Amino acid sequence: MKKPYFVSITLFITIAVLILDQVTKAVIAKSMAIGDSYTVIPKFLYITSHRNNGAAWGILSGRMSFFFIVTIVVLGLLVFFYIKEAKGNFLMQVAISLLFAGALGNFIDRMLHGEVVDFIDTKIFSYDFPIFNGADSSLTIGVILVLIALLFDSRKSKV
């Protein structure tokens, strides 16, 4: 039986997530000054305008050339992995689409603005989690789905 690629679905997911990410960042950048914050759910969720020229928690701040190179390599590896390993695995294809969209979304910010627009600000059990954006969420969900897909794949091979 021929294993399919779900190209139209994965392209739709990638493009939709990328557009949503870029539009939300543009709205925040245009309508809020850096540091402005609005409460969505008191003591839990805020929209806070923030800029980050590093990775999560400001790691490697100001190392744009490093991020450019790493992102290009990662995007290439994701395409390779999609073609070579994800055939017939719908969940893995969705996961790779989310990873690709997230990496590309933050890459676009770094290329155009030299920094990433972050705005989702959460406090979980009094821990003030680092401010993040839609691309970061896409990357996180993509990683979780890759792990789930690999778990299911390893279980199938044992049966």
From Swiss-Prot:
Biological processes per GO annotation: proteolysis
This protein's UniProt keywords: Aspartyl protease, Cell membrane, Hydrolase, Membrane, Protease, Transmembrane, Transmembrane helix
GO MF annotation list: aspartic-type endopeptidase activity
Entry annotated with the keyword Transmembrane helix: yes
Residues spanning the membrane: 4-24, 64-84, 88-108, 131-151
Chief localization: membrane
Reactions that this protein is recorded to catalyse: Release of signal peptides from bacterial membrane prolipoproteins. Hydrolyzes -Xaa-Yaa-Zaa-|-(S,diacylglyceryl)Cys-, in which Xaa is hydrophobic (preferably Leu), and Yaa (Ala or Ser) and Zaa (Gly or Ala) have small, neutral side chains
Keyword check for Nucleotide-binding: no
Location of the protein in the cell: Cell membrane
PROSITE patterns: SPASE_II (PS00855)
Active site, per annotation: 118, 136
CC per GO annotation: plasma membrane
Pathway in which this enzyme or protein is active: Protein modification; lipoprotein biosynthesis (signal peptide cleavage)
Pfam families: Peptidase_A8
Top-level division of the source organism's lineage: Bacteria
Enzyme's top EC category: hydrolase
Membrane association type: Multi-pass membrane protein
Family: Belongs to the peptidase A8 family.
Function: This protein specifically catalyzes the removal of signal peptides from prolipoproteins.
Family annotation (NCBIfam families): lspA (TIGR00077)
Name of this protein: Lipoprotein signal peptidase
Organism: Staphylococcus carnosus (strain TM300)
Gene (UniProt): lspA
